[in-house]
Curated annotation (Swiss-Prot):
Gene from which the chain derives: Gpatch11
Modification Phosphoserine occurs at: 115
Top-level taxonomic group: Eukaryota
Residue ranges constituting the G-patch domain according to the UniProt record: 69-115
Organism of provenance: Mus musculus (Mouse)
UniProt biased composition (Acidic residues): 192-213
Protein name, UniProt field: G patch domain-containing protein 11
Pfam family, one: DUF4187
Amino acid sequence: MTEEEDYMSDSFINVQEDVRPGVPMLRQIREARRKEEKQQQANLRNRQKSVKEEERERRDIGLKNALGCENKGFALLQKMGYKSGQALGKSGDGIVEPIPLNVKTGKSGIGHESSLKRKAEERLENYRRKIHMKNQNEAKAAEEFRMRLKSKQDEMRLEGDLRRSQRACQQLDAQKNIQVPREAWYWLRPEEETEEEEEEEEKEEQDEDECPSEDLSVLEKLQILTGYLREEHLYCIWCGTAYEDKEDLSSNCPGPTSADHD
């Protein structure tokens, strides 16, 4: 009677492993080949990169080294009087180092990068021009606003000086018993007038041969009225003083305008 087989023994396991010996072996071979191909591709890329680096290094070294006498072109230059290390040109201020090479490594066409650079510079220049024009317009608008404000302030100041002159003229004329002003606008008009008085005054103004006062500007009225005050009453509204005589007025008053008193 044969001995009972031990399924856990090495002989049984080895027999079972050898049932299909080709299947796992093929899988291992394919995996090894795949790894080997990847390694070869990586080595090839590294080798190509190293070749490019070596080419660049050799090129840089060659450009840094001066040409020797064995170079035919350099020998011809020497015969023409050129010396090694000498700058080009009659004045001797030309370049000494060789013109560097710009190796193109990208895939874009020739001139594409320079075109992009030129367009970028144009966009930047247009942006700067717009900013400059905007700043100019803002400065112009601010200056116009200041001028309008100054003009308005000057107009208000002139109107204030005219009212002061009218008030002073009315008081000084009254001191001399002058009942009617030389011109209607020399005195301040009453704040409240009846409609009949206004209509009568309008008729009188229409009958006058001279130009109506409305044709005069505030500045013109002020100049006329201050001249009347100085001539008739020896009075200056900016000094606020009635002088004794014309000599006293001319000696102590700075002048007939507001600017003279600034």
